[in-house]
Amino acid sequence: MNLKDIAKIINSDFSGEYFEITKMNTLRDATKSEISFVANAKYIKEIQNSNAGAIIVSKDTKEFVPSGCVALVVENPYWEMATLSKYFAPSIEDETLPEPKIGEGTTISPRAEIARGAIIGKGCTIMAHVYIGTNAVIGDNTIIYPSVTVYRDCRVGSECIIHANTTIGSDGFGFATNKQGEHRKIYQNGNVEIEDNVEIGSSTTIDRAVFGTTLIKYGVRIDNLVQVGHNCVIGEHSVLVAQAGISGSTTMGRNVVMGGQSATAGHLSIAPFTTMAARSGVTKSIDKSGLTFAGFPLLEHRLWLKLQAKIARLIKQN
């Protein structure tokens, strides 16, 4: 899409050199042929270091756009990013793509549907009512149980097991809101990648990234009814127990354990070998590895146990 057309769509005055923009991306990852945005002044350093060809900004952050990068000034960058995301959304299905490629020894139920452009490796088992989307890739020896959906462009590694009714790559919960309180969808144009030797329980949802990838690393174990938000990274051999909820853009180190019904806020970082007891609520990043936490507000587990004992004594005294 030409930058001239983009400027018109988002109502930005621009009179510089026009060139083609191929996709939207983050400030950190965007290249000269890509466009990004900034909706918060706390990302000034990221603006200054960005290699994006163009950045959607407010008048307050325009001055921080580096030379050689086009600043598209608008009143509400987040809203206009949402507007533009629709124009870069790929087709849900593409009939021009080749027929799916199926590896040797793979068994596919006649009641499953495999979209064009998909690739399924050797020795897989694909059961009834499974849908594998356009350009999705399934590795070797992976088992996919009934009614699983793997959306377009998503990748599942080898030796994985995905249980019934799980959804891989549905849209993340992303929308912009204007001054009038109206909402506008942010089209989620990234994907999900699940590395090798991952097992995912029934009725779990892993959302696709806005840009880039939601990543489930090697050896992760995910229980039933777990929600993983867009752009999350779940570290190697981590364990997410039933009804855990991981908000968008949270990054976990390896061997993190999230107990049942525990949850995180978004945009957090959790150190390796951290354990959250059931129903823990994580609102801040955890930098020190190897600790166990419980409760809400979150406390180290031993302090939480002491607090519960004191509360019990107070109740007994009264």
UniProtKB/Swiss-Prot annotation:
It catalyses: a UDP-3-O-[(3R)-3-hydroxyacyl]-alpha-D-glucosamine + a (3R)-hydroxyacyl-[ACP] = a UDP-2-N,3-O-bis[(3R)-3-hydroxyacyl]-alpha-D-glucosamine + holo-[ACP] + H(+). The keyword Manganese does not apply. GO terms for biological process: lipid A biosynthetic process. The keyword Thylakoid does not apply. It holds the Pfam family LpxD. Pathway: Bacterial outer membrane biogenesis; LPS lipid A biosynthesis. The active site is at residue 230. One of its GO terms (molecular function) is N-acyltransferase activity. InterPro entries: Hexapep, LpxD, Trimer_LpxA-like_sf, UDP_GlcNAc_AcTrfase_non-rep. Homotrimer. This is UDP-3-O-acylglucosamine N-acyltransferase 1. It comes from Sulfurimonas denitrificans (strain ATCC 33889 / DSM 1251). The lineage of its organism: Bacteria, Pseudomonadati, Campylobacterota, Epsilonproteobacteria, Campylobacterales.
